[in-house]
């Protein structure tokens, strides 16, 4: 789901998602990170 992390590209979300969900699957959507 969406996490409270601002982003400009999906790479910024990989680390953030790994911290939150343990998964590096994520993308930047509307300047906010979405983790899978």
UniProtKB/Swiss-Prot annotation:
Localization per record: Secreted
Chain positions covered by the region annotation Interaction with Ca(2+)-activated K(+) channels: 26-33
Disulfide bonds: 7-28, 13-33, 17-35
Site (Basic residue of the functional dyad): 27
Keywords of this entry: Calcium-activated potassium channel impairing toxin, Disulfide bond, Ion channel impairing toxin, Neurotoxin, Potassium channel impairing toxin, Secreted, Toxin
Coiled-coil features, chain-numbered ranges: none
CC annotations in GO: extracellular region
Domain remark from Swiss-Prot or TrEMBL: Has the structural arrangement of an alpha-helix connected to antiparallel beta-sheets by disulfide bonds (CS-alpha/beta).
Protein name in UniProt: Potassium channel toxin alpha-KTx 16.5
